[in-house]
Regions:
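Short S/T/G/P-rich N-terminal loop/turn motif that feeds into the first structured element of a domain
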Residues: 1-33, 37-39, 43-48, 65, ...
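Short beta-strand-to-loop capping motifs
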Residues: 8-10, 53-57
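An amphipathic, aromatic/His-enriched active-site/gating alpha helix that lines ligand/cofactor pockets
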Residues: 55-84
Length: 84
């Protein structure tokens, strides 16, 4: 399993924390189907940028969860490594 940061450029524009939590909970509800584990997310309601940290078998699996749960896909996905 690898760590991924995925970026949605405008998905959160104008959304509040409660709405983002609901969006995230839909990802969590189906993540096991794809072998994905979402760990954290950050968002900026002004710019709409959202960043999701996940552990997953592939970038495609991360996007499959987002697509199935919320009808959106990440604009960018990066493999990341945790520093010490």
């Amino acid at each position: 399993m690898a760590l991924f940061i995925d970026v949605h450029h405008t998905a959160a524009k104008g959304l509040d924390a409660q709405t983002m939590a609901e969006v995230h909970s839909r990802d969590l509800a189906i993540q096991d189907r794809y072998g994905v584990r979402f760990l954290r997310y950050w968002f900026d309601p002004v710019t709409g940028k959202t960043f999701c940290l996940s552990e997953a078998p592939s970038m495609e699996a991360v996007n499959a969860v987002h697509q199935q749960a919320n009808g959106t896909m990440a604009d960018e996905i990066f493999v990341v490594y945790e520093g010490q």
